[in-house]
Amino acid sequence: MTKEKPAVFYNRIIDKGRLKKLMSWAYTSFGSAHCATMADELKTLGFRYATQAGVSISVDDLQVPPIKRQMLDSAEQEIKTTEARYSRGEITEVERFQKVIDTWNSTSESLKDEVVKNFRETNPLNSVYMMAFSGARGNLSQVRQLVGMRGLMADPQGEIIDLPIKTNFREGLTVTEYIISSYGARKGLVDTALRTADSGYLTRRLVDVSQDVIVREEDCGTARGLKLRAMTDGEREQISLEDRLFGRVLNADVVDPKTGEVIAQRNQDIDADLAKKIATTVAEVEVRSPLTCEAARSVCRKCYGWSLAHGHMVDMGEAVGIIAAQSIGEPGTQLTMRTFHTGGVFTKEAARTIKASKAGTIQFKDGLSTRRMRTPHGDEVEQVEVAGTLVLKPSDNGKMVSHALSPGSFVLVAEGASVKKGDLLVEVGAGQKTQKSTERATKDVSSDLAGEVLFDNLIAEEKTDRQGNTTRSAQRSGLMWVLAGDVYNLPAGAEPVVENGTHVNVGDILAETKLVSLSGGVVRLIPNSREIEIVTASVLLDEAKVLHETGGGSEQYIIETSKGDQFLLKTAPGTKVQNNANIAELIDDRYRTTTGGIIKYSGVEVAKGTKKQGYEVLKGGTLLWIPEETHEVNKDSSLRIVEDGQYVEAGTEVVKDIFSQSAGVAEVIEKNDILREVIIKPGELHLTEEAIADKYHEQLIQPGEEVIPGVTIDKLSYGEKVISTEGVALLVRPVEEFQVEDTPVEPSQGSINEQGAGRNIELHAVQRLFFKDGERVKSVDGVSLLSTQLIIEIGAIEGEDEDVLANLYADIELQDDPTDDEVKRLQLVILESLILRRDSDSDPFGGQVQTRLMVEDGQEIVPGAVVARTEIQCKEPGEVRGIRSGQEAIRRLLIVRDSDRQTLAIDGKAKVKENTLVVAGTEIAEGVVIEDSAQVLKVSDKEIVLRHARPYRVSGGAVLHIDEGDLVQRGDNLVLLVFERAKTGDIIQGLPRIEELLEARKPKEAAVLARRPGTCQVEYLDDETVDVKVIEDDGVISEYPVSLNQSVMVVDGQRVGPAEPLTDGLNNPHEILEIFFDYYAESKGIYEAALIGLRESQRFLVEEVQRVYQSQGIDISDKHIEVIVRQMTAKVRIDDGGDTTMLPGELIELRQVEQVNEAMSITGGAPARYTPVLLGITKASLNTDSFISAASFQETTRVLTEAAIEGKSDWLRGLKENVIIGRLIPAGTGFASQNDFVDEGTSRSPNGYSNVVTNDNGAGLSSRTYDDLDGSEILDDQTARAFTEGKSNRKDIISGDELISDDTPIPSDVQGKAPVIDDDAMIDDNWMKDQ
């Protein structure tokens, strides 16, 4: 078989990338069969040579570049310099941190380059180098960690740790480095696990939204197209125009702007060579795209372009939607949530720099203007404000070199300066175009030494917020000095006893605290304790003994008086009780009843009180008690056994399982068929007339009275009329009497009352009744009617507050009797307890503390006497400073020690004045340079006295925690620096960002977009806010509110178009759509406006999705994203149906609405008005025409219910609906076209293939000629088929489309030969038998 193509000879190293290109070239040029064979042969070749070379990998192959040590040293040197600048107060803590991080970052980067250079120059056959750079395994970042340095890591909060990992895995990590490493590594693992699930769900949603997109038409005939240009990020090209054009179809002729020659025509598809040619001549090309395709419910072949699977025009019936969904979903697992395959190593793009190519002088041209600016490293540089050109005029009068600079770049040289070759001229900023999104962050700065604070050129301003909190912040940048000294924290209540300027020695008292007794009394010192008790008043029960009884797991104390009365102690010894507390109760059974009953007072008077505490008896008398037993039942009435009014004997069962304890008349109380209570009333029952019963009802009957003839009462009784089972009767109930004395039993007590205190304390017995007069007591077992309690009474002193009494407590104590060891006595004491400070105080800044006791045990003291003094003593000699009096008094005191000063001898004249602050490195006299910053205390001819100090640079806007003159300890916070930092890329990137875009979510911090074109006015106001106005073309001024944490991206006078961002942040695609629609609706009509709006938001979405994938180095063809975005932007929301049948709020395809509106314009009806909407993929899936597909996706019940209510039909157009109900799917490239077969029956290919065979580019099969086949030829299906069709007179090849039936005559020249059969051929069995 002869080939017309020239032989190709490759002579170069083939790595992974080139191998990809080779395979793709083989595939597009020779088809799948040849490509597969070649791949096989390459594999064999590879194994063969790998075996011969014996490539292996060992630890020795990991060669660390020898220059590494030197690079680390220079980085450390640079950091030392930065630290020195920091200690001189030239840069802030934030700038220092930033500089350290950038230094290590660039060191790590340049070390990486060295690693590569080292391998390349010393041993290009090193197995690690070959492996990584051929693309077999591993990447540069991993090689860097093996033989370079691991670099900076982030901690779990995502903050960068400024201690880099200087070692690599070959050298081994230190313990610290290992721990720091494990943060990021763990994060990577967790991330992978979470990612898999997320990515799978994303793919499912994508498939669902696009499963019904199938190529159903040849050409939709649209004139619309999409303008393509290279996708850039700032200056950097992300996807070249060449790559974006490949496999597209042109929508307009491409004309060479120089020669006017037509390079390519409309509707021509673009292969790789043509793409390259077009990209080199023009910057923007209009192509056809699925986004602009007008085919109904599908995409046409021309708009889709090549099928990237085989590099030819897409076949009819190809399910391009599903391919698109898989192409976007599959790389999802490679996208990150946070870190990317580097085990948490921090990576950041280094700024691009421009260096002088030769020596010369610098000129600014084209209106280049700059302003002074402080870089993040604290260097003062010029930043480009208005773009222009920087020109280097060589000193050898050669050709001038010019560099165009965009705003934001840093110019490191002055105009007119002369530079040497290799000098750094410019750090190129990323430019205004990129989203330099920043966030406000804060950092605390704490003091490195103790001392007093001095402000140098630092002005504090106070702001009060709405809540009334006052914050003090620095108006502009300045220095805060801490002058060294020993700061003593004074304990609460300590008063200084020295004055400012006094000189003190070790052991001198600086301040003291007095411990004062308020009430006075007798001192009690407790051994081994820091507590001093002062007894103010006490009472001792001198004749009563205290008995201690234990039993049954509980213990109790009983007080026995000399008369034999016993009181039970209610509160345990050692507890503190308040005034009027009940501490003991008389053990006494005289008032105990056996059952419940009714209580009546006879002569007894009680005070008002509460049921809980009881009613205090004021005057004695008799208590009358009429017993009865009450059973509270609360059960169903059917369980009752006795009747109301029935007389029962003791022991009778009255209700199931309840027995009466005494004989008497039963009273039954029922409510709603529930038996509440059964009351048994003991007594004698006499049947009598009603009049008599009424007379004695609820009356006391005196002894000797005859109630009924023949019945005389012999003791005090109580009458009650009852209706018994036998009729009216009088129940005579017994009455018990209890005598109550006027005064209760009281134990004898001797009390001491300390002089000066004048406070009294005594125990006082009280009788308390627990029931009111006439109260019915419900009980079966009996109750105690009266109890005698011992109450503690603390006497008040004249003229004292009630609060004092309420706060006094008495202590219950048991005292040993001096005469009898067995006996304990009860004592009640009122104490004041004072706690001494610990001498070994935990505060290391407190100085030597010594506490002296001023009283002895048993000593009587007057109120206000000093019990102890705590003295704070000086630790090192020095001069006292920093004491303030009055309102400003602070609990600290400063001593300037001799070690805080330094005296330097000088020869010549001093160059500094007294009281000035000088930073390290300053020359203070001829030849005398100080090493540390200091304050000049004294200048004389011979010497200069300095006081050590430390400056801290404070940036403008920082929050000040302290004031001038304050004393600070080491480690105290001085200021909170507020600074802007670039948002770390992982805020949202990777999968979450893709999801946010495809679900069309509104971003959290959206950018403010201009609504109409115009010119910006940017005004920076005093209170740090920025005022942005746009003067629109018709003169209208619109204001745009900017929130505090957004930075403005436009400059004054800049021209902006519609939907251009004014601030940083992510654009909201809904807003882009709305702005363009509103802007063009009036001038172009709503259909065109809707198309423009949708086109802009489509472009935004496609580019943003591409950006995310590109940032991870994943290439996806635009057309896949376009297919998905097309599905998201197909619908509009009806605002007003006009004369159509559409309802407001309905979501309908734009195409459909426009068809209806066109019909309306012909009939003269009012058209429907609508707004274009952007649906997220989930929403779009739920709003498809097919309810079966939507229901199988999410919210099944809702979707099906709505479809049923609306009476929807499903036309089964997509793949999913057909699969669900078990039909064949309406897709696939082999489906027969409706067109008749062409060319008088010679070519029988369905139109899907006729195009492949006659592909214009010769990339297809038409460029081959076939001679006779020999047995070694490799054929794939298409080749075989095309071959048959090309030579339809040959009978020895049977293609798959020829169906041979039983009666087909077999050509004579075929008989006996084995035919070449492709795998689609359907061959009749009989024919095979005959062979």
From Swiss-Prot:
SUPFAM superfamilies: beta and beta-prime subunits of DNA dependent RNA-polymerase (SSF64484). GO terms for molecular function: DNA binding; DNA-directed RNA polymerase activity; zinc ion binding. Residues 1243-1257 have a biased composition (Polar residues). Keywords: DNA-directed RNA polymerase, Metal-binding, Nucleotidyltransferase, Transcription, Transferase, Zinc. Its cofactor is Zn(2+). The keyword Metal-binding applies. Its EC number is 2.7.7.6. It catalyses: RNA(n) + a ribonucleoside 5'-triphosphate = RNA(n+1) + diphosphate. GO terms for cellular component: DNA-directed RNA polymerase complex. The keyword Metal-binding applies. Binds 1 Zn(2+) ion per subunit. Residues 1236-1257, 1294-1331 are annotated as: Disordered. It comes from the Bacteria. Belongs to the RNA polymerase beta' chain family. RpoC2 subfamily. DNA-dependent RNA polymerase catalyzes the transcription of DNA into RNA using the four ribonucleoside triphosphates as substrates. In cyanobacteria the RNAP catalytic core is composed of 2 alpha, 1 beta, 1 beta', 1 gamma and 1 omega subunit. When a sigma factor is associated with the core the holoenzyme is formed, which can initiate transcription. This is DNA-directed RNA polymerase subunit beta'. The lineage of its organism: Bacteria, Bacillati, Cyanobacteriota, Cyanophyceae, Oscillatoriophycideae. The gene is rpoC2.
